[in-house]
From Swiss-Prot:
One of its GO terms (molecular function) is adenyl-nucleotide exchange factor activity. GO terms for biological process: cytoplasm protein quality control by the ubiquitin-proteasome system; regulation of translation. The keyword Nucleotide-binding does not apply. It is found in: Cytoplasm. GO terms for cellular component: cytosol; endoplasmic reticulum. Residues 16-35 are annotated as: Disordered. Signal peptide: none annotated. It comes from Aspergillus oryzae (strain ATCC 42149 / RIB 40) (Yellow koji mold). Keywords: Cytoplasm, Repeat, Translation regulation. This is Hsp70 nucleotide exchange factor fes1. Belongs to the FES1 family.
């Protein structure tokens, strides 16, 4: 990644949590920018219009970096989720090579990272057949089923169910993959119509209520 873009990402993360109460008046804006560490090169990168693709790649690098702490990774994740609310950006995950590193984060040791990964996946695939297909291709459905039924963190389980719900609605290949990996007692081996919203809702309601052992 370009050094200026990397520095710009770091600056953005650092200043996204800065209190606004100490902001100077307009006449001191230039000095304040320097004090906060914005270099001319970084400003050039910013106003030169870093593309959404650049920002998505930079965020993913931060999410996998050992040099970025959890708090700032979660900020980067939030920025990433907002970017992929755009269907064009969601469809760019595959050509940018971001599906694999995103799916890998479903198995992160930190519950908040797993939760955000599931949230981003749910956002990307919602009403987006191309992204729904990629979720199947990258074998994320079984991981999401495991998360929704065994993860010890309730918020993480909730986002895993959200991702599954978004993935299977009106997309039969994802629904077939889900049914194949449901725990014992669910509709295993049965054909569930991905276009039947009542049937989809029934499965999701069961997943939300799925008991998780306290030792999980």
């Amino acid at each position: 990644m370009d050094a200026n873009m990397n520095n710009l990402l770091k600056w953005s993360i650092q200043n996204s949590t800065t209190q606004q109460s100490d902001a100077p008046n307009a006449s001191n804006n230039t000095a304040d920018s320097s004090a906060r560490g914005l270099t001319p090169e970084m400003l050039s990168a910013l106003f030169g219009g870093p593309s959404d693709a650049d920002l998505m790649k930079a965020a993913m690098e931060a999410l996998h970096s050992d040099e970025v702490d959890l708090e700032n990774k979660l900020i980067a994740f939030d920025n990433f989720e907002q970017l992929i609310e755009s269907i064009d950006n969601a469809n760019n995950l595959e050509p940018l090579g971001l599906w694999t590193p995103l799916v890998e984060l479903l198995q992160h040791e930190e519950a908040e990272m797993r939760r955000m990964a599931a949230w981003c996946i749910g956002t990307a695939v919602q009403n987006n057949e191309k992204a729904q297909d990629k979720l199947v291709v990258f074998n994320a459905v079984p991981k999401l089923v495991t998360m929704s039924t065994t993860d010890s963190n309730p918020a993480t389980r909730k986002k895993a169910v959200f991702a599954l719900s978004s993935a299977v609605r009106n997309y039969q290949p994802a629904m077939d993959e889900l049914v194949k990996h449901l725990p014992e007692g669910y509709s295993q081996g049965e054909k569930v119509d991905a276009g039947d919203m009542d049937a989809v809702d029934a499965i999701m309601d069961r997943l939300r209520a799925h008991p998780v052992p306290s030792s999980a």
